[in-house]
């Protein structure tokens, strides 16, 4: 071979560095190096260049030495030393090695021929590099150093070889002695030139096979730990990526107060509060808002500021943020240096970075008193369930030393409970119409009475009347008003009594010396409690329309069919009316059905007589507003005899001038006028109910006449009319049964009326009906 000087390339032709993307790849220090031992170096910083092992061809990899990490002293040419030690002719930088491409050896297969090689220049250059990079100029430049260590003689054995034997070795993978001399130990898969360097005991290399440069975080350039070098070594964590985030323990920085009131913070002045996030392993340490997890550690990072009232006063609460795990979602750990600070999990204060130390000390001196006893009392939080506030009270009522004035609401609660309406249970506004009711029920009752509305319940006359559902059923609401005792006469009586009292007061003031003058009280007062008659007024059915077409010529068949259809609807209304009568539903169900079957014709005929008496003075038969039987229609075949019986009822009502209250009581007694011969299942209750309405009829007579000598006479006349109704109804039923059984007449009957007639015919034919009469014939 030629002289060694011819192998040295120009200094200006050294290639530039390429940033590595992966760790643990085989590296070639210079592109002019085409053979020799291939060295694998674990990446120590992102500035190392690493070659990929994806193909079989050897790739070029360059190492860059930053200016900040190497001294300005002239160093021996490393390329020259490597070239001379390997015995390769490199020539110029563009010179190519002739022959086939060199095979890229796999890991663990590199071997060299035994011998000795002079590596003094390489050792001197690497030693100089070690001395220059052992003490970096600053922490940041030391972290970005390209190569910070070199292999020792113990790890890199000295061998003698020439170019031909070296190339033959790379192709055949055997040495000249026929054996495989391995460059690494058995437990190594790569050749580590930094193995013998000493590292601190806290190095992460303890968990990475004694190599501190195999951490995944050192590959990314943004993950450098250079800002934490030197004085920030206490921030380094020991562990691997599988460990949980551990809280950072820092020296106690609890503020203390001197005797003169000055604040002394024990935290070192050189400890700064970085705003950027710093990654170590798989964890991030930063200051960020979150939910407090109470831990008793003396670190000062951020200040708790609560919106609204100043809950902890103007004092600072020392809270430290430890770590955020980015693997499983955000998870915050905080420390609080005050033992008296209690925080619930659902409270989320907003954290702000504390101001600089001078401002913090000024706030402390301004808000905190002097004395050592104040060191531990930084304020107490008060949340729901907590009762103590030492500072920053949001209201005087929360302070134990400030007595709030007595509340008026406490005295109101000790008074009597609010009065409720007797109708709908709403809050009563006063006594209206003799009953304690609300304003809504007062107006409703007045309109119902003065408007003479005939309400009808769509249910069973037992609807619930309360504040919410009082408008659903006016019939049940009106009935409840009457049951409570509401009466329009109560207001008039109250006015009369008030006027009499005022007149009496004036007389007593004029003649105070006369003790004989006393308050005048009327002898009789109207009854303020609800009566059965008033309830009967409420439940009275409305007048129904027949739907008769008067434009079509009249006929007996057409009129009778229309009357039957109207009668069927009136029977349905009579059933609802009977169930609404007080006491009727207390009877047995079979008794109720029996009474309705026996009395349905009584009710129809008596109501027809009342309408005829009120509208036509007993001259016409007013079945419905659109169906009135006049004298002309009475002349139709089979009509006159039946109309004559019905006109008798209206004429008697007209002769006696029966009042509406008397009519209602008489109509109810007609419902109870016929029973089976064997009696009812609830006979005793039936007799009691019947006697009750007989008394009601007597009360109605007394209310109308007012003279006891005439009351008995009128009672006799009215009861005599009730007894005569049996004969009228018997004649009407005979004709009805005849038309029902005679199919040649083709008179239609509604379904319900046909069912009643079918059940009633056998009973009348067998004589199983007992008439309840007031007078003997």
UniProtKB/Swiss-Prot annotation:
Chief site of localization: cytoplasm
Zn finger intervals (NR C4-type): 421-441, 457-476
Record keywords, A-Z: Acetylation, Chromatin regulator, Chromosome, Cytoplasm, Cytoskeleton, DNA-binding, Isopeptide bond, Lipid-binding, Metal-binding, Methylation, Mitochondrion, Nucleus, Phosphoprotein, Receptor, Steroid-binding, Transcription, Transcription regulation, Ubl conjugation, Zinc, Zinc-finger
Residues bearing the modification Omega-N-methylarginine: 23
GO terms, molecular function: DNA-binding transcription factor activity; nuclear glucocorticoid receptor activity; nuclear receptor activity; sequence-specific double-stranded DNA binding; steroid binding; steroid hormone binding; zinc ion binding
Residues annotated to bind DNA: 421-486
Chain positions with Phosphothreonine modification: 8
Organism: Pongo abelii
Annotated domain remarks: Composed of three domains: a modulating N-terminal domain, a DNA-binding domain and a C-terminal ligand-binding domain. The ligand-binding domain is required for correct chromosome segregation during mitosis although ligand binding is not required.
Subunit annotation: Heteromultimeric cytoplasmic complex with HSP90AA1, HSPA1A/HSPA1B, and FKBP5 or another immunophilin such as PPID, STIP1, or the immunophilin homolog PPP5C. Upon ligand binding FKBP5 dissociates from the complex and FKBP4 takes its place, thereby linking the complex to dynein and mediating transport to the nucleus, where the complex dissociates. Probably forms a complex composed of chaperones HSP90 and HSP70, co-chaperones CDC37, PPP5C, TSC1 and client protein TSC2, CDK4, AKT, RAF1 and NR3C1; this complex does not contain co-chaperones STIP1/HOP and PTGES3/p23. Directly interacts with UNC45A.
Domain NR LBD as annotated: residue spans: 524-758
Region entry Interaction with CLOCK, spans: 485-777
Subcellular locations according to the entry: Cytoplasm; Nucleus; Mitochondrion; Cytoplasm, Cytoskeleton, Spindle
Biological process according to GO: cellular response to glucocorticoid stimulus; cellular response to steroid hormone stimulus; chromatin organization; positive regulation of transcription by RNA polymerase II
Modified residues (N6-acetyllysine): 480, 492, 494-495
The keyword Cytoplasm is assigned to this record: yes
Annotated segments matching region Disordered: 1-23, 130-183, 394-415
Glycyl lysine isopeptide (Lys-Gly) (interchain with G-Cter in SUMO2) crosslink residues: 258, 277, 293
Family: Belongs to the nuclear hormone receptor family. NR3 subfamily.
Gene that this polypeptide is encoded by: NR3C1
Low complexity composition bias: residue spans: 141-150, 394-414
Region (Modulating): 1-420
Pfam families: GCR (PF02155), Hormone_recep (PF00104), zf-C4 (PF00105)
Protein name: Glucocorticoid receptor
Record's compositionally biased regions (Basic and acidic residues): 1-14, 152-163
Biological function: Receptor for glucocorticoids (GC). Has a dual mode of action: as a transcription factor that binds to glucocorticoid response elements (GRE), both for nuclear and mitochondrial DNA, and as a modulator of other transcription factors. Affects inflammatory responses, cellular proliferation and differentiation in target tissues. Involved in chromatin remodeling. Plays a role in rapid mRNA degradation by binding to the 5' UTR of target mRNAs and interacting with PNRC2 in a ligand-dependent manner which recruits the RNA helicase UPF1 and the mRNA-decapping enzyme DCP1A, leading to RNA decay.
GO CC, alphabetical: centrosome; chromosome; cytoplasm; mitochondrion; nuclear speck; nucleus; spindle
């Amino acid at each position: 071979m030629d002289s060694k000087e011819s192998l040295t390339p120009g200094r200006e032709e050294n290639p530039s560095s390429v940033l590595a993307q992966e760790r643990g790849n085989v590296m070639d220090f210079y592109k002019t190096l085409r053979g020799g031992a291939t060295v694998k170096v674990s990446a120590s910083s992102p500035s190392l260049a690493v070659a990929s092992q994806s193909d079989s061809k050897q790739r070029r990899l360059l190492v860059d030495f930053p200016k900040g990490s190497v001294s300005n002293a002239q160093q021996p040419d490393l390329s020259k030393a490597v070239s001379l030690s390997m015995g390769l002719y490199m020539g110029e930088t563009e010179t190519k090695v002739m022959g086939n491409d060199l095979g890229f050896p796999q890991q663990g297969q590199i071997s060299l021929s035994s011998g000795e090689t002079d590596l003094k220049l390489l050792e001197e250059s690497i030693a100089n590099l070690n001395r220059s990079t052992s003490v970096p100029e600053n922490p940041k430049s030391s972290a970005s150093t390209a190569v910070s260590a070199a292999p020792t003689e113990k790890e890199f054995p000295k061998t003698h070889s020439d170019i031909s034997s070296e190339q033959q070795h790379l192709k055949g993978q055997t040495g000249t002695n026929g054996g495989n001399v391995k460059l690494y130990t058995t437990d190594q898969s790569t050749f580590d030139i930094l193995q013998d360097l000493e590292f601190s005991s806290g190095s992460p290399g303890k968990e990475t096979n004694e190599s501190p440069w195999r951490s995944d975080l050192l590959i990314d350039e943004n993950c450098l730990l250079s800002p934490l070098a030197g004085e920030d070594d206490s921030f380094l964590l020991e562990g691997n990526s599988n460990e949980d985030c551990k809280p950072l323990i820092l020296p106690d920085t609890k503020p203390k107060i001197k005797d003169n009131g000055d604040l002394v913070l024990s935290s070192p002045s050189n400890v700064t509060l970085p705003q950027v996030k710093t990654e170590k392993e798989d964890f991030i340490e930063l200051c960020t808002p979150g939910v407090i997890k109470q831990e008793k550690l003396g670190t000062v990072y951020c200040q708790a500021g609560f919106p609204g009232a100043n809950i902890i006063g103007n004092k600072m609460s020392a809270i430290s943020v430890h770590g955020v795990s980015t693997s499983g979602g955000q998870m915050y750990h905080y420390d609080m240096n005050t033992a008296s600070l209690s925080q619930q999990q659902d409270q989320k204060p907003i954290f702000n970075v504390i101001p600089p130390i001078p401002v913090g000390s000024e706030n402390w001196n301004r808000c905190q008193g002097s004395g050592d006893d104040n060191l531990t009392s930084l304020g107490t939080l008060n949340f729901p369930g907590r009762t103590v506030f030492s500072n920053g009270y949001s209201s005087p009522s929360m302070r134990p030393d400030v007595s709030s004035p007595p509340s008026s609401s406490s005295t109101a609660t000790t008074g009597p409970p609010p009065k409720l309406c007797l109708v709908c249970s709403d809050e009563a506004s006063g006594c209206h119409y003799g009953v304690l009711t609300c304003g809504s029920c007062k107006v409703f009752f007045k309109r119902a009475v003065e408007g003479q509305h005939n309400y009808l319940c769509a249910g069973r006359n037992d609807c619930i009347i309360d504040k919410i559902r009082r408008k659903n059923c006016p019939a049940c609401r009106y009935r409840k008003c009457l049951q409570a005792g509401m009466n329009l006469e109560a207001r008039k009586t109250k006015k009369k009594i008030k006027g009499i009292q005022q007149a009496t007061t004036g007389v007593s003031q004029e003649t105070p010396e006369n003790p004989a003058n006393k308050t005048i009280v009327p002898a009789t007062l109207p009854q303020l409690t609800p009566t059965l008659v008033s309830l009967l007024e409420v439940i009275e059915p409305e007048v129904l329309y027949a739907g008769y077409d008067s434009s079509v010529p009249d006929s007996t068949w057409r009129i009778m069919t229309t009357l039957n259809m109207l009668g069927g609807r009136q029977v349905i209304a009579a059933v609802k009316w009977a169930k609404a009568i007080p006491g009727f539903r207390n009877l047995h169900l079979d008794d109720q059905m029996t009474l309705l079957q026996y009395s349905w014709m009584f009710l129809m005929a008596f109501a027809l007589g009342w309408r005829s008496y009120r509208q036509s003075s007993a001259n016409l038969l007013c079945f419905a507003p659109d169906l009135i039987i006049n004298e002309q229609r009475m002349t139709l075949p089979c009509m006159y005899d039946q109309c004559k019986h019905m006109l008798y009822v209206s004429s008697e009502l007209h002769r006696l001038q029966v009042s509406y209250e008397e009519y209602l009581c008489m109509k109810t007694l007609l419902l109870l006028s016929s029973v089976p011969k064997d009696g009812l299942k609830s006979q005793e209750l039936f007799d009691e109910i019947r006697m009750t309405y007989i008394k009601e009829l007597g009360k109605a007579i007394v209310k109308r006449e007012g003279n006891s000598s005439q009351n008995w006479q009128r009672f006799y006349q009215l009861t005599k009319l009730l007894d005569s109704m049996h004969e009228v109804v018997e004649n009407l039923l005979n004709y009805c049964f005849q038309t029902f059984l005679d199919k040649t007449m083709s008179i239609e009957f509604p379904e319900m009326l046909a069912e009643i007639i079918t059940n009633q015919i056998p009973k009348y034919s067998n004589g199983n009906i007992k008439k309840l009469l007031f007078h003997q014939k």
